[in-house]
Amino acid sequence: MQSPERITPYDTECPKNEQVEAMFNHIAGHYDRLNHLFSWGMDRVWRQKAIRMIEPFAPHTVLDVATGTGDLAIEICRHIPSVKQVTGVDLSLEMMRIGEQKVRSENLDNRITFMQKDCLDLPFADHSFDAVTVAFGLRNFQNIKLGLEEMYRVLNEGAPLMILELSRPVSFPWKQGYNFYASHVIPVVGRFLSQDAEAYTYLPESIAAMPQREELADLMLSVGFREAYYRSLSLEVATVYMGLK
């Protein structure tokens, strides 16, 4: 199995972060609809369950990494009353432009701001945030360990990192059903609806390549988190990870 850093959307010599930026800029207008479609609407449920895991920490400031179109940032503001400010960072300007429209429609533009930044080089001081979140974005990092180190760095002491990510089921028959769906359904439907064949071939490949469950929890511990654990969701097709600084 290839390392996640070697799995890229396009067959070019460009660095992974540049390819990921180009991919999301291209599919931004289709992203939300396809996200809901391919997850059978469960992506909303997964976000709500993930948010409940950081709510007890009553954060005031949250950094949402790989914020995309802002779905998680918006849900955080809706469901965690203590949150005063969410800063969303992403490589893709087109995704964040859609996010800005959604934020304005929710009258949350005084609580959510967007910045085009690389998660591997965050422009924030150490100990800047009460929580850091990343949903469906970790597998797109050019270097997952470096990304974890950066998110750890900007967290306050005792604060949580919450990662929500797609995962490969390991139990029968969910594993077999998922493999068929990921290999045959997602690429075909994604290519038809988004007009980007590579983007929805990359999706299942990037899920398969990234560290999961115990491996990712161990990686979180290795960069300094004093505690790391995870919870599987919906027949193992999604996982929430928590790391405490």
Swiss-Prot record:
Q: Does the UniProt entry include the keyword S-adenosyl-L-methionine?
A: yes
**Highest rank taxon of the organism:** Bacteria
Binding of S-adenosyl-L-methionine, residues: T69, D90, D118, C119
What organism is this sequence from?
Answer: Porphyromonas gingivalis (strain ATCC BAA-308 / W83)
Q: What is the designated name of this protein?
A: Demethylmenaquinone methyltransferase
Q: Which InterPro entries match?
A: SAM-dependent_MTases_sf, UbiE/COQ5_MeTrFase
The record's comment on protein family reads:
Belongs to the class I-like SAM-binding methyltransferase superfamily. MenG/UbiE family.
Q: Any idea what job this protein has?
A: Methyltransferase required for the conversion of demethylmenaquinol (DMKH2) to menaquinol (MKH2).
Record has Ribonucleoprotein as a keyword: no
